[in-house]
Amino acid sequence: MCSVCEGSAEGLVTRKRTHSGGGRSAGSKRKWHRRMGGLSFLIFFVIGSLFSGLMFALLSYAPSYRSRVTPHYLPDGRFLQIADEARVLEPYLSAAVRLPDSLNGTPAGKQQQTARSNEQEALSSLKVAVEMKLMGKDDKALRLFQHAMALSPRHPEILTKYGEFLEHSQQDIVTADHYYYQALTVNPSHSEALANRQRTASIVEHLDQKRFERLDKKRDALSSVHALDAGLKRAEKEAYIQHIYHSVGIEGNTMSLAQTRSILETKMAVDGKSIDEHNEILGLDAAMKYINATLVNKNDFITLKDLLEIHRRVLGHVDPVEGGEFRRTQVYVGGHIPPGPGDLSILMSRFEGWLNAEQSFLMHPVRYAAMAHYKLVHIHPFSDGNGRTSRLLMNTLLMRAGYPPVIIQKQHRHKYYDYLQVANEGDIRPFVRFIADCTERTLDLYLWATSELSHPVPLLAQEEMGGAIGEREHGFGREGGSTVHEGSGTGDSIRIGTMW
């Protein structure tokens, strides 16, 4: 073979060897990639399995963890919406809900330690008070009892012993019965409180009934006054202004009686007072005109629609968007949480049913009106204006029964709130008596204003007039003209209606 052919043959062999070696190298790479792909899939599968198992374990563990940890449903204290009006617990709701200790600024452990220390000191004071009572030193005993009550106001033994002291040494059986009632609320099996309550309950009920009979007699005496009597007309017009002045004043409005009168008569602004204070007066004015025109002599039930219409006018100048609408947010007051917005529909439906139930109509009108006020102010269905609306409802019910509207004086606001709190704790009778006392003072003022005889000035008139019987600022005097313009309209007086 020639050298050229031999060279060509050797080159061909070399190329075949090179090609064969490259093929083996590419095959190895493909096998390596297949192996790495399978390994990557295995790694991802293992990691995914571990992650899934971990998540399953966490989800399975979470419920048991939540069950052992006390939940914090409430936001931080600085985000709480604090309402300015009092409310009480509804009788048909099971119990009050209190804010967690973490929100009241004092550690729970320190609170418990302070409570135990106060209780020990209270019991020591109680022991000495009982000794002073036996020695006939009633003044010292009274101060010691009051000190013990201030330290531990919910201790059943202190409540019972203090009640016995009031009943036997102070002849105050009504307050004594209330303390026996409170003691049984804390400890229903307290033997002494049970025995005392069995003795006093019927007596106190009889006294309450006599109070209502006295109110009925005064109401009947006022009903005998001719509707066109000049004194009655002046009294009605002044009561209209006084009701607005005191009702907004209870909620913190700083307008004086003269300024309130000026706004209602002239509709002119008062210097130095906020727009909201003006609008609160105008809103209550509109609500009372609506009540006089529609509800006082309405021969039908009072419905939720009526309540919403009252509230729509109460807030009509302050917050027209919220006026006549149930609140849509949770609100908080002190240590109590009112019903949530989701419960308002059913609670207000129950309230409407109670308001128009035959059993409710059988109550004395003053008790019925006071309880309606109590129930509505607890449910707190509105974002604002609950107290004003509740007082308007109470007076609507009283006027439909022939009573004048009750004037709850702003200087008695703390007593008013205290009695609501007592009702919150389970005994509504003190609040009913408070409303009865306000009703009697108002009746006395009407009777004095319409009487031709020279009677002493009623207590309410003395407080408002500062002892000046004929003072023009008060406007209830029998002599001279009324301080309210005669042309202010029929809606500018509170009229006494009749029961349907």
Swiss-Prot record:
Q: Where is this region: Disordered?
A: 477-500
Q: How does it sit in the membrane?
A: Single-pass membrane protein
The record places the motif (Inhibitory (S/T)XXXE(G/N) motif) at 247-252
- Boundaries of every Fido domain copy: 302-437
Active site per the UniProt annotation: 380
The UniProt annotation places ATP binding at 251, 333-336, 384-391, 416-417, 424
Q: What is this protein called?
A: Protein adenylyltransferase Fic
**Organism of origin:** Culex quinquefasciatus (Southern house mosquito)
Taxonomic lineage from the root: Eukaryota, Metazoa, Ecdysozoa, Arthropoda, Hexapoda
